[in-house]
Amino acid sequence: MLEEQLYLLACIFASRADTRNIKKLSTRLGSQSKYLEILCVLWPELDDPKNLLFLRELEEEVQSPEGEETTDEDVIVELLESDSSLIPLIESDTTTRSNRYHELQEFISKKLNNKTLENFEEWLRERILICNEMIPETPLLYSVLWETAKSKVLSTKFIGWVEGVLKPLDHLNKRLHLIFKINEWEKMPDSELFKIIFDGVEDMQGYIGIADVIEDELAPTLSYGKKWETFITEFFNKQQFSLKSDTNYQLFIKLYYSLEKGVKDNSEASRKLQSNVVDILFHNSENLFNLSSLTHKLDELWSILSGFPDEITIEEQKTITALEMKQFMEFFIKCSTKFSFKEIFAITQEEESAQLAHFSSLCHEEFNKANEISSFLQAMYETVLDISKDDKIFTRISMDEKLYSILEILLQMNEFAYIEAIIERFDYSNNTQIYELLVKFFWHFFNNASNGLRKEPEMKKASQTLQIIQKHMSQRAGTNLTKLEVLLEISDKLSHYSINLNKSHNGARDTAFKPSNILEYRDCPLDIISNLLELNPRLYKDLPTTKSLLFGIYDSLSINREGQTGKVEVDLMVLHIDYALVNLDFGTAYELGKQVFEICQEAGQHMMKALGDEHWLTFYQMGKFVDPNWVDNEIPTEIIVLQMSILGRLLEVCPLEEVEIVTSQWSTLELELSARDLVKDKYALDGQNDNKSKVGGIAREIFHNVTNF
């Protein structure tokens, strides 16, 4: 009966976290284990652990203030007198009390999985696990108890559990913002355990670094669970360490040194670690060269490899040894910052085309690194481009092929200063192959230009390429050099005007002018001038400018105009006449028309005939021209006279089948002129009566010429 009452009181005080009263029962339950089990299970999980510090002193028996022993009955009476609410629970009938007693015992035993707690250490471990089930985010909740425990109260096994399980788990939960319970963590398979520890390590930001994860999570976990070899086999491999990022590389390095320290007394595990390092570098070294501080990383890796026995091999490929890896690393440091260990070995065995592809790839990548061109070129001059040495890597590529490849890459990068320096260094002036390469890129830049202005980036590149040709390839270029120079000049001049030469697939024009459009007009260069006159309304008055442009187009496109200069000029002037009429400028059209007839007449009958056959319609339109701005839409008298003059000249050269229509228009004008009152001519341009004799005289002369014709 007393045993049951004391047990129930202990359960009540434990559930109330009543430190003062529970301490009075520490030696009253028959065994210390019962007392510890009650406190372990029933003490509120959320209560401050400091309230349980008294358990560290369980070895000392609780004495009465006077030092006299008290009986169990006295303790029960004292406790009930201090709290009368306990009486119904404790002084109930025997059956009820006994049932409560057994039910509580069964509950506590089940909660502890039938474990018996013999001492403070066992109690503390189970208490930590029980509280962790309710408060899993704080596995170190009871740290105050183990940190303040007296020496030798807690075993090294328990301390190892704290250091190898609780502390790493607490660190991981905080880092990942996850909650793993202690029981869950301890039962987790190794592969999943390793994966969780390294989850997000490569993306970490803030105060926690890679070293913290290794030092505070991984190393204690591996050491406590004796999982070093398992980790090396299952996790420290080429799949996990691609070396594609600086973080992955740093993780690889820091982890290696941690593992090396962990297995230093285990030769088999140490050799396995070294083999895995060689395997990782052999398969993933190509990714190193995308990382920052490459020189430092190569030195770091060389330091690691140099400490390996030469005979260390890769399990999957026994022919690759640590000795070969050291030799490859030496080549890396001196010559290359691109190829992987596997590729270096393969390159030496490949044919010419494959070696050239690798060489070009190497140069392209190195040249594209900021501020690396000059230093890399110097390194190349000292190694694979040193004419005094044999190239031991790219053994099947000639010097010309190497330089051609380098120049092509530099042209793509627009590094013209380096291009010129290489041509001068290796005396490649007027080299046919290099000249053809330069011309190829001239056209590449020219065709990609968005406009023809010299300041346009692609046009500037084309100009710089041409300058190199002018300086170093003039003999090889010959007359082609002048044509390219003129083409750039014409492109620049055309771009200062409104112009649209870009033809779409359906024949319509797009909006933008590109210099390459000029090349589409080789068979019809005059169409370019026509487009200019159409889009630049004032240009029809500037014949010298369009003439210069047209002849420049002929020269740049290598169009032969020998013996055709006069006809080309006449065609251009007639085009100007058309656009003068479009712009309602009869005066300019008339003056140009007179010049055309004079030029053709001086050139001979064949030019006159060609003029009539090809351009009679333009002059006929002059004879029919009406300016809507004229008074009453009537042709001024002076203009009628000039139109009759032009039509009279046209009758001399127009095709026979067109004579009737030209004569008809001339007659219409003559009839209109005869109907004018030349004394009071309100349609005269100057409104003066003395025009009568002048206009009449010209009219009679024209009439006489037509009659004779």
From Swiss-Prot:
Superkingdom of the source species: Eukaryota
Q: Which UniProt keywords apply?
A: Endoplasmic reticulum, ER-Golgi transport, Membrane, Protein transport, Transport
**How would you describe this protein's topology in the membrane?**
Peripheral membrane protein
**Which compartments does it reside in?**
Endoplasmic reticulum membrane
Q: Which Pfam families match?
A: Sec39
Protein name, entry field: Protein transport protein SEC39
**For this UniProt entry, which residues form the secretion signal?**
none
Q: What does this protein do?
A: Required for protein transport between the Golgi and the endoplasmic reticulum. May contribute to tethering of coatomer-coated retrograde transport vesicles to the ER membrane through interaction with and stabilization of the SNARE complex.
What organism is the protein native to? Saccharomyces cerevisiae (strain ATCC 204508 / S288c) (Baker's yeast)
Does the keyword field hold Membrane?
yes
Q: Look up keyword Ribosomal protein and say if it applies.
A: no
Q: What is the lineage of its organism?
A: Eukaryota, Fungi, Dikarya, Ascomycota, Saccharomycotina
Gene Ontology CC entries for this record:
Dsl1/NZR complex; endoplasmic reticulum; endoplasmic reticulum membrane; nuclear envelope
GO biological process annotations for this chain's record? ER-dependent peroxisome organization; protein transport; retrograde vesicle-mediated transport, Golgi to endoplasmic reticulum; vesicle-mediated transport
**Family per similarity comment:** Belongs to the SEC39 family.
Q: What else is known?
A: Cells with a reduced level of SEC39 show a defect in post-translational processing of PRC1/CPY.
Subunit structure, interactors included: Component of a peripheral membrane protein complex consisting of DSL1, SEC39/DSL3 and TIP20. Bound to a SNARE complex consisting of UFE1, USE1, SEC20 and SEC22 or YKT6 through direct interaction of TIP20 with SEC20. Interacts with TIP20 and DSL1.
